[in-house]
A protein has these predicted regions:
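Flavin-dependent oxidoreductase catalytic cores
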Residues: 1-193
Length: 193
């Protein structure tokens, strides 16, 4: 009902948060999803919960209401000494991206990390600008829907470079705006942000 309420309130679209160890991500990840029923095991079963939500929104809100999904394209389990193959890898994310696009998702928002690797989801300031952009670049090669690039995008010039290189179609820069509420205005005026 959340998407229906958003639509009735005039919200332009919805973005499902299927990243960072939250509920939908827990179903998608072989690391957290140890179920043996129709919602666990193979990729189709692990994606079932997300796909049911997508189909439910599409049925309730109609074919023209934009649906996006934010995913952790890589869980980086190796950052904590775990086997990365036990979780979501870039290759697995490519399969999920195709499934989501096939289900009618209009936008793919690419992030990374889960609770166990939270520094890859909410990076400390020491992380290089745009260090996750390679994930978005790769996922963009397997889908025909717009891809959002996030990850410590501090500079408007760097954001523009990513767009010019076709690394992504949109830039997610929420943290830049939290750090500097004038970020977008500075970008428009050619100032350093």
């Amino acid at each position: 009902n959340g998407a229906v309420r958003c639509q009735k309130a005039g919200v332009d679209g919805v973005l499902l948060h299927a990243a960072h160890g939250y509920l939908i991500n827990e179903f998608l990840s072989p690391y957290t999803n140890r179920r043996t029923d129709d919602y666990g095991g193979n990729i189709e079963n692990r994606a079932r919960f997300a796909l049911e939500i997508i189909h439910g929104i599409r049925d309730a809100c109609g074919p023209d209401y934009p649906i996006g999904i934010r995913i952790s394209a890589c869980e980086y389990l190796d950052y904590n000494g775990l086997d990365p193959a036990e979780g979501i890898t870039l290759e697995l994310s490519k399969q999920y991206a195709k499934l989501f696009e096939g289900a009618g998702v209009d936008l793919l928002d690419v992030s990374a990390g889960i609770y166990e690797t939270m520094n890859t989801a909410w990076e400390p300031t020491g992380f290089d600008q745009g260090w996750k952009t390679a994930l978005a670049r790769e996922l963009k090669t397997v889908v025909n829907i717009p891809v959002v690039c996030t990850s410590v995008i501090r500079s408007p010039d760097y954001a523009e470079q990513l767009l010019q290189e076709h690394a992504c179609d949109f830039i997610g820069s929420a943290r830049a705006h939290l750090a500097d509420p004038a970020w977008a205005n500075k970008a428009l005026n050619g100032q350093d942000a």
